[in-house]
From Swiss-Prot:
This is Hydroxylamine reductase. It is found in: Cytoplasm. GO terms for molecular function: 4 iron, 4 sulfur cluster binding; hydroxylamine reductase activity; metal ion binding; peroxidase activity. Its EC number is 1.7.99.1. The keyword Iron applies.
């Protein structure tokens, strides 16, 4: 076994990748990610002690946030970047220890190895990485709970990073990241204590999504009902993918008046719903579908491509020289745009200059799709929605948020959407929408049957909408609403969304296309018995189950 990773839905055989990641990451990169996590656990241990002494280092918090984000599925495949991050982490950890001593603190004599181990060479890193991976925790249930917590923290870090880019942060979220990471080194914690920490992660998941919602809406306005073009124009263009709206804003400013159009891809589609971006005439529309189709769609786009966050798949040679990464994203041999300097826009001139020399996109479809149904927009038409429920025109809502992916079994979600009765409405967020957002599913009294709230973090909007409906209908429990949850997951942001929903009291969530490989039988049993978590079966049986047939 040259590596072990089971953090994503597509993990080999549903149990773990051991030679190379299904995502495309090499064993070297997987092991360095394990080592980076180990170093960050040591940083977290020291950070907790520093915080008790009133020492809060933003550089340390930012490093851990970005380090967690860099290890998310399909974010960074660059060996050299992880070697550099491990070195940076060790230096930050040791400077934090020096601050503790300077402030009169006494470092514990029995510090965990992650807080004291040090090395500098790539060879030493490789040796240590082999000792500190996931399987270093021998107890299957403890391992499962620790990894569930870590994957929740990774998703939390991603959302915190997006908010941070817009100038929004919350010290309590950073403090919990440290608490959670440090807890995964504590062998004295019982399974019940780890379960409690996992649920506490759900609380901070709600907090971080609320923070990001505030950051996005304060910066760019509240999403509104919007028709998005899916065709192309005959101009050179840049395709922007990922989730980072600040990067999009910088790119739109710099491309204005250059003759270069900008299109979104994948999870960047919901940017079109924000009022602030509608003033850009060269912001043309959305090109293509979910992340996993990029190997074909990046080819036919012809222009320059910018990856602001995950999801990146190992690029084909046919477009690799047109591809740029930024932020935590990386791939060996792909050009990387450095971080923005304080008070300045990020410099995308290299992307723009290349785009000018390239042909216009090849058209792959035409028409429009509709979205923008985040909480503020839905509240604006709340009377209509409530009346539709009271009159019986709408019998049930289906939350089908989450992720898309490569597996053929995900066609289930397309067929499920088609099979739902005409008196039902789908609430969605995340790239799971691409399984049904181009189907002609119609409307109910002018309300579209697919209401897209936005990116995966906008699952927060769906939770806010559910809580508002609970209030409007005078119910005691959110589970009394005519809402069913049939969620597709893929990576770690879906994990924090799930934990957030559990924290809010939502029960009977169906998760697919398979249950996470990192859930041990006993941990899965806890989730089933306490929260009603279930998998999916067939479209017909599941529709009948949800509709109470």
């Amino acid at each position: 076994m040259s590596m072990f990773c089971f953090q994503c839905q597509e993990t080999a055989k549903g149990t773990g990748c051991t030679i190379k990641g299904v995502c495309g990451k090499t064993a070297d990169v997987a092991n360095l990610q394990d080592l980076l996590l180990y170093v960050m656990k040591g940083i977290a241990i020291n950070s907790l002690q520093a915080r008790e002494l009133g020492i809060v280092r933003q550089d340390v918090d930012k490093f851990v946030m970005e380090g967690l984000f860099a290890t998310i599925t399909n974010a960074n495949f660059d060996n050299a970047r992880f070697v550099a991050l491990v070195r940076e982490g060790l230096a930050l950890r040791d400077s934090l220890k020096a601050d503790i001593v300077k402030a009169g603190g006494v470092l514990p004599a029995n510090l965990h190895d992650s807080a004291i181990w040090t090395a500098d060479s790539a060879e030493e890193f490789e040796q240590k990485a082999a000792q500190v991976g996931i399987l270093a925790t021998e107890n299957e249930d403890v391992r499962s709970l620790r990894e569930l917590l870590i994957y929740g923290l990774k998703g939390m870090a991603a959302y915190a990073e997006h908010a941070f880019a817009l100038g929004y942060e919350d010290n309590s979220i950073f403090a919990f990241m440290m608490k959670g990471l440090a807890a995964t080194t504590d062998d004295s914690l019982s399974a019940d204590q780890l379960v409690a920490l996992v649920l506490e992660a759900g609380k901070y998941g709600v907090d971080v999504m609320a923070l990001l919602d505030k950051a996005n809406t304060t910066s760019y306005g509240n999403p509104e009902i919007t028709k998005v073009n899916i065709g192309v124009r005959n101009n050179p263009a840049i395709l922007i993918s990922g989730h980072d709206l600040r990067d999009l804003e910088d790119l739109l400013k710099q491309t204005e008046g250059t003759g270069v159009d900008v299109y979104t891809h994948g999870e960047m589609l919901p940017a079109h719903y924000y009022p602030a971006f509608k003033k850009y005439a060269h912001f043309v529309g959305n090109y293509g579908n979910a992340w996993w189709k990029q190997d074909k769609e990046f080819d036919s786009f012809n222009g320059a491509i910018l990856l602001t966050t995950n999801c990146l798949v190992p690029p084909k040679d046919s477009y690799k020289d047109r591809l740029f990464t930024t932020s935590v994203v990386g791939y060996e041999g792909v050009k990387h745009i450095p971080a923005r300097e304080a008070g300045k826009v990020k410099d995308f001139s290299a992307v723009i200059e290349l785009a000018k020399t390239l042909p216009a996109p090849t058209e792959i479809e035409t028409g429009e799709i509709v979205g923008g149904f985040a909480h503020n927009q839905v509240f604006a038409v709340a009377d209509k929605v409530v009346e539709a429920v009271k009159s019986g025109a709408v019998k049930r809502f289906f939350v089908m948020a989450g992720c898309d992916g490569r597996m053929k079994s995900r066609d289930y979600y397309t067929e499920f959407a088609k099979a739902l009765p005409q008196d039902t409405i789908i609430l969605t967020a995340g790239c799971a929408k691409y399984k049904y957002n181009k189907l002609a599913l119609g409307d109910i009294g002018g309300i579209p049957r697919v209401l897209d709230a936005g990116q995966c973090n906008d699952s927060y909007s769906l939770a806010v909408i559910a809580l508002k409906l609970k209030e409007v209908f005078g119910l005691d429990d959110v589970n009394q609403l005519p809402i069913s949850y049939n969620i597709a997951w893929y990576e770690q942001k879906a994990v924090i969304v799930l934990l957030a929903l559990l924290y809010l009291g939502v029960k009977n969530i169906h998760l697919g296309p398979t249950l996470p490989g990192f859930l041990s039988p006993n941990v899965a049993k806890v989730l089933v018995e306490n929260f009603g978590i279930a998998g999916i079966t067939t479209v017909e049986d599941d529709v009948n189950l949800f509709m109470g047939a």
